[in-house]
Amino acid sequence: MKQFEIVIEPIQTEQYREFTINEYQGAVVVFTGHVREWTKGVKTEYLEYEAYIPMAEKKLAQIGDEINEKWPGTITSIVHRIGPLQISDIAVLIAVSSPHRKDAYRANEYAIERIKEIVPIWKKEIWEDGSKWQGHQKGNYEEAKREE
């Protein structure tokens, strides 16, 4: 387990939560994002995630650094799963601890928004009658590689 990582296997939540705990932390907020069955009235069969792993892990660590600058004393761990994910599977987990709960909540919300903005992860939604790629705001895989 790494503090910031992309994985293929199902996410085991407890190890990431435990990573953020020490004697100075008074709160831990854990967010898990799951695959939902229905989106805007369309039934999802499953999702497929892809990532440019070296850069994605660097960007996840960058988010951890940003959080520590904005909310000193926090400890963050972020993991995102790639590959095919079934309904209710965990796609992303963010664990943030801090001396006080407000910082942990704010930092956790900040993390999920930054993941969507800067981490090169792409999501393909597969429905009964088709599919569509969604994802990273900065473009495709080749563009992400050039940024490295």
UniProtKB/Swiss-Prot annotation:
The lineage of its organism: Bacteria, Bacillati, Bacillota, Bacilli, Bacillales. GO terms for biological process: Mo-molybdopterin cofactor biosynthetic process. Keywords: Molybdenum cofactor biosynthesis, Transferase. This is Molybdopterin synthase catalytic subunit. Converts molybdopterin precursor Z to molybdopterin. This requires the incorporation of two sulfur atoms into precursor Z to generate a dithiolene group. The sulfur is provided by MoaD. Substrate binds at residues 34-36, 44, 100-101, 116, 123-125. Pathway: Cofactor biosynthesis; molybdopterin biosynthesis. Belongs to the MoaE family. The keyword Transferase applies. Heterotetramer of 2 MoaD subunits and 2 MoaE subunits. Also stable as homodimer. The enzyme changes between these two forms during catalysis. InterPro entries: MoaE_sf, Mopterin_biosynth_MoaE. Its EC number is 2.8.1.12. It comes from Staphylococcus aureus (strain N315). GO terms for molecular function: molybdopterin synthase activity. It catalyses: 2 [molybdopterin-synthase sulfur-carrier protein]-C-terminal-Gly-aminoethanethioate + cyclic pyranopterin phosphate + H2O = molybdopterin + 2 [molybdopterin-synthase sulfur-carrier protein]-C-terminal Gly-Gly + 2 H(+). PANTHER family: MOLYBDOPTERIN SYNTHASE RELATED.
